[in-house]
Amino acid sequence: MGNSFRSDRVAVEIQREINDILRNKVRDPRVQDVNITDVQLTGDLSQATVYYSLLSNLASDNEKAATALKKATGLFKSELAKRMTIFKIPDLTFAKDESVEYGSKIDELLRGLNDKSEY
């Protein structure tokens, strides 16, 4: 129970730091439009899934961003080690956040229902 609060705090800190590292340290143009939306940590803080979103919906941009993020994982871990005061930096796994697209799809469906009900 108490561990959940700690993992939530660490996840928020990791999210903030990775966003900062993306903006200030990573020079790869493939991650220019990447935004970290969430971080989920395991209870023992050994694994972190970092969810990201892109401004572009193109599949090729998504693949390029995923490749660039995977390539920069070492940089993220070393920077996190310098910035954070936890014993071990978790292993990072990047995953595209589908919730933004899902929310847009739901919004579109709801607008479609509203349009039909106006007839």
From Swiss-Prot:
Q: Which GO terms describe its molecular function?
A: ribosomal small subunit binding
Cellular component (GO) terms are: cytosol
Question: Transit peptide: is it a keyword of this entry?
Answer: no
Its annotated compartments are: Cytoplasm
Which keywords annotate this record?
A: Cytoplasm, Ribosome biogenesis
Write down the PROSITE patterns for this protein, in alphabetical order. Answer: RBFA (PS01319)
Its signal peptide is none
Mainly localized where?
cytoplasm
Q: What does this protein do?
A: One of several proteins that assist in the late maturation steps of the functional core of the 30S ribosomal subunit. Associates with free 30S ribosomal subunits (but not with 30S subunits that are part of 70S ribosomes or polysomes). Required for efficient processing of 16S rRNA. May interact with the 5'-terminal helix region of 16S rRNA.
Q: Describe its assembly.
A: Monomer. Binds 30S ribosomal subunits, but not 50S ribosomal subunits or 70S ribosomes.
State the protein's name.
Ribosome-binding factor A
- Source organism per UniProt: Lactococcus lactis subsp. cremoris (strain MG1363)
Gene name for this UniProt entry: rbfA
